[in-house]
Amino acid sequence: MRLAYWMYAGPAHIGTLRVASSFKNVHAIMHAPLGDDYFNVMRSMLERERDFAPVTISIVDRHVLARGSREKVIENILRKDKEERPDLIILTPTCTSSILQEDLQNFANKASRISDSDVIFANIDHYRVNELQAADRTLEQVVKYYLDRSHGQETLDQSVTDVPSANIIGIFTLGFHNQHDCRELRRLLRDLDIKINQVIPEGGSVKDLINLPRAWFNLVPYREVGLMTAMYLENEFGMPYVSTTPMGAVDMAECIQQIHRNVNTLAPISSNKKVDYEPYIDGQTRFVSRAARFSRSIDCHNLTGKETVVFGDATHAASITKISIREMGIRVSCTGTYCKHDAEWFKEQIQDFCDKILITDDHTEVGDMIARVEPSAIFGTQMERHIGKRLDIPCGVISSPVHIQSFPLGYRPFLGYEGTNQIADPVYNSFALGMEDHLLDIFGGHDTKEIMTRSLSTGIGLIWDPESRRELSKIPHFVRNKVERNIEKFAQQKGIVNITTEVIYAAREVLGI
């Protein structure tokens, strides 16, 4: 545990609550002190849903500390069982209440014997895993609970469907554009004549989990959540899974080709007919996807050689890096992820695409790296957007964690062929806005900006005289801050405190700026 004002991935119990509140008719009991109960407000604000989050807090107060939690926890479980009639109740502590070292598994076992609902304890180590890891493990635990029970009762139907079908695993509440991505994945599978068997956990029912093995394969669009469930289903039931994220034209083709191989494995047995998705890939790439045509346009060619920094979760950071380089000709100076647990996969994916790889969950390291590189644009999380504002570098948000403005009401998928179009817009506009500011500087306008000293400036303690400021204002806005920082670095190296026009001319001559 550490105290921080910014965390890329939240505490473990948030991941468990996200999975629980994604299922239909599942309730979560959170054993925690007041102050840990912000999930309900956060979900209601960001997802803008009509219903309250199905989460109840079992408060740890002075009475609990004096007498223990057993009676209170069981009472809350039975009360919610009577009031809500859920199919499943998930009991979870928080990292704070875990300090008490209470046997919550025992409480859950006792409550399950006297309640009508199923009750399970989210078996997560709150000191070792973060929000995303906990969500992945909780989803696997729920799926395993129902499949193991059905298998033990000999009621599990493992016969595959008559037509090609798939489970989509990993779509859940508060995910980055997850609702839009799910619609796009449904459209993709419908175009390929593949039936949707189940989507979990978002909108899924735990009663239907016993039908998961009937699908021909599993589709896991994000590595962060769903991969453990897919691996469990593969090990126990021999179900193949596709984990290539269908983001960008190149990876879209690779994902569909993997689906093609999985379908054709069972097609001769089930329908005596193989499928061919190559014409679909060719048609979508050449004639339907506007992003593919845009990548060959003169506007996109203007981005060739532009520098950028990419940072986010492993899935989105890796995909945006590859799209930037392969499909738009942008140079990625540094790419990184805060998913330290998935660092090996991340490095393997992008080692040939960028100059430097950064694996960290410390936002100050990311900020320092961006200040050193001084890219033309940033693609990251909400924190990188803040950093970009301080450095006057445009930033496109491509990954969680995000603020409410990245939960759009309109249709904005990142996956599928429509997703490639949506990604191209913020990528291109992030660079184009620099020229817009330059034109405003030249011709004037109501939002013309004055020169501002940035808090991340390299020249802390340096003094610019009025004449040197006027000289600096003649430099186009979209490169002005970069020139300013280079002049300040030059002055520091020479031991100069007062920056005059002579210092500017000397720096420009030496540095070629």
Curated annotation (Swiss-Prot):
The active site is at 299 (proton donor). One of its GO terms (cellular component) is chloroplast. Substrate binds at residues 434-435. GO terms for molecular function: 4 iron, 4 sulfur cluster binding; ATP binding; metal ion binding; oxidoreductase activity, acting on iron-sulfur proteins as donors; oxidoreductase activity, acting on the CH-CH group of donors, iron-sulfur protein as acceptor. Its EC number is 1.3.7.7. Its cofactor is [4Fe-4S] cluster. [4Fe-4S] cluster binds at residue 36. Binds 1 [4Fe-4S] cluster per heterodimer. The cluster is bound at the heterodimer interface by residues from both subunits. It catalyses: chlorophyllide a + oxidized 2[4Fe-4S]-[ferredoxin] + 2 ADP + 2 phosphate = protochlorophyllide a + reduced 2[4Fe-4S]-[ferredoxin] + 2 ATP + 2 H2O. InterPro entries: ChlB/BchB/BchZ, LI-POR_suB-like_C, Nase/OxRdtase_comp1, P-CP_red_C, Protochl_reductB, Protochlorophyllide_Rdtase. It is an enzyme of class 1 (oxidoreductase). SUPFAM superfamilies: Helical backbone' metal receptor (SSF53807). Signal peptide: none annotated. Pathway: Porphyrin-containing compound metabolism; chlorophyll biosynthesis (light-independent). One of its GO terms (biological process) is photosynthesis, dark reaction. Keywords: 4Fe-4S, ATP-binding, Chlorophyll biosynthesis, Chloroplast, Iron, Iron-sulfur, Metal-binding, Nucleotide-binding, Oxidoreductase, Photosynthesis, Plastid. It is found in: Plastid, Chloroplast. Component of the dark-operative protochlorophyllide reductase (DPOR) that uses Mg-ATP and reduced ferredoxin to reduce ring D of protochlorophyllide (Pchlide) to form chlorophyllide a (Chlide). This reaction is light-independent. The NB-protein (ChlN-ChlB) is the catalytic component of the complex. Belongs to the ChlB/BchB/BchZ family. Protochlorophyllide reductase is composed of three subunits; ChlL, ChlN and ChlB. Forms a heterotetramer of two ChlB and two ChlN subunits. This is Light-independent protochlorophyllide reductase subunit B. It comes from Cycas taitungensis. The gene is chlB.
